Amino acid sequence: MSSFLMGYPHAPHHVQSPMSMGNGLDPKFPPLADDYHHYNGHYSMTASTGHMSGAVGGGAGVGSVGGGGAGGMTGHPHSMHPADMVSDYMAHHHNPHSHSHSHTHSLPHHHSNSAISGHHQASAGGYSSNYANATPPSHPHSHPHAHPHQSLGYYVHHAPEFISAGAVHSDPTNGYGPAANVPNTSNGGGGGGSGAVLGGGAVGGSANGYYGGYGGGYGTANGSVGSTHSQGHSPHSQMMDLPLQCSSTEPPTNTALGLQELGLKLEKRIEEAVPAGQQLQELGMRLRCDDMGSENDDMSEEDRLMLDRSPDELGSNDNDDDLGDSDSDEDLMAETTDGERIIYPWMKKIHVAGVANGSYQPGMEPKRQRTAYTRHQILELEKEFHYNRYLTRRRRIEIAHTLVLSERQIKIWFQNRRMKWKKDNKLPNTKNVRKKTVDANGNPTPVAKKPTKRAASKKQQQAQQQQQSQQQQTQQTPVMNECIRSDSLESIGDVSSSLGNPPYIPAAPETTSSYPGSQQHLSNNNNNGSGNNNNNNNNNNSNLNNNNNNNQMGHTNLHGHLQQQQSDLMTNLQLHIKQDYDLTAL
């Protein structure tokens, strides 16, 4: 039945084609019948699968395949059976025929399952009870396989497809041979046995046990259900599907270490599961054992999810589900028993300063808080802005990672910083002004205004300088007038020195040297006022008075020269004052 459920026609007991791993092996039952045609390989597969013929028909034999298909095979002569077997295979297989599945199901054949799962291999023996149940030696297939272990066979062979084939088979066997079922049931754990096949056997076991439990209920059909139940198994069957099929093809599960580990896992699973009537739940199957009629449609969402898990996940998480912290629950965002969704850290957005944690319902987030940058972040951003006012995307990503900020925050900070920079430098806001102030030529007018503003500021500075220089000149005029009245170049030199312009002291004599008349007057003044000069060398006023008194000679030429010199001196003073102002202004 399960074979049908499995989607295998009866004929294809061995729908092991997937199991063809065994193809290399000489088919136990050369598929003479069409049913076996693919199953040839499969059959042999079964040998390798072991669990095909062994598990189901010779479940043990096959099982042993895992451990040693041949042994299992021998278990049922089937293994040895030639093609004729194949043709009869159904009968044989199903027949008590040497199968008599007595074949030593007791042997690890059950391994058949184990073979499939590759779990039990050695432990099969240990499990044999389970497997046996599963495969149940008890059924000593005498059931007569006629009934057809076919179905068994199917299971067995198909089972491979479903991995727990062995287990399933055992169920089928059970189905056929309630006795077998009983064992499975006993596997309550029986399922455990069959389960052994599956998930590390345990799951499968439970499945079988489960079915066994059911199984007894289902009877033959149940058996098929069991296999079918590869749903139960299905985690096994589907999940383990490949691995089981691949007892040969998947070296990883077939390695000695892999088999030993699987065996250990199975032992643990069975030990833990057998005592509990609800192995399936403990194993993470969570099938409802109370539903005698539950078939594939009866699986809950979580059960379906469980089917998708890999054997390794099953092995590691079977016992964790009740705790609610199994990987599968996390990965599948399973709900807790309260129906509340668990929010794991990986489901949350990475925390970034100023960004919501994702703990609010969409649309209900509070107003975004103003992002508070740390001093370190601001320092780094200012450094970068100092060198580049505009960031490339690559550089922006680098800064975002180093400062633990989002790219968007970096981008906005730089936009704001550029606006601040333009404001500080009194530059036009190109972002908003560009659209309004574009000339017919497309040139932004603000750019044209820049020089005008600077020029205006320069003009203002020059005007201020001129005003200040004029004020200074007005203050200097009385002294200069005295110089003019004195008609003395010497006094001009004194005035210039009094104004703090030593550079111009030599200028007076140098300029006067070009004028012979002025030279004469200097000598005259010195001669005439020699007495006064000797007495009052440091008295400028006395000098001026003497000069005024002594120089009433009315030399117009000299007076003209003095005026010219005065104008030159004034221009020099103005320039000098401007230079000083420029320095102070800066």
Curated annotation (Swiss-Prot):
For this entry, the protein name equals Homeotic protein deformed
Biased composition annotated in UniProt, kind: Basic residues: 92-112
What function is annotated for this protein?
A: Sequence-specific transcription factor which is part of a developmental regulatory system that provides cells with specific positional identities on the anterior-posterior axis. Homeotic protein controlling Drosophila head development. Transcriptional activator of the apoptotic activator protein rpr in cells at the maxillary/mandibular boundary.
Q: Where is the composition biased (Low complexity)?
A: 458-477, 522-551
Is the keyword DNA-binding in the record?
A: yes
Where is it localised? Nucleus
Instruction: Recall the GO molecular function terms of this protein's record.
Output: DNA binding; DNA-binding transcription factor activity, RNA polymerase II-specific; DNA-binding transcription factor binding; molecular adaptor activity; RNA polymerase II cis-regulatory region sequence-specific DNA binding; RNA polymerase II transcription regulatory region sequence-specific DNA binding; sequence-specific DNA binding
Alphabetical UniProt keywords: Developmental protein, DNA-binding, Homeobox, Nucleus, Transcription, Transcription regulation
GO CC: one term?
A: nucleus
> Known InterPro entries for this protein?
Antp_homeobox_Deformed_sf, HD, HD_metazoa, Homeobox_antennapedia, Homeobox_Antennapedia_CS, Homeobox_CS, Homeodomain-like_sf
GO biological process per UniProt: anterior/posterior pattern specification; embryonic brain development; head development; head morphogenesis; negative regulation of transcription by RNA polymerase II; positive regulation of apoptotic process involved in morphogenesis; positive regulation of transcription by RNA polymerase II; posterior head segmentation
Q: Which cysteines bridge via disulfide bonds?
A: none
**Keyword Chloroplast in record:** no
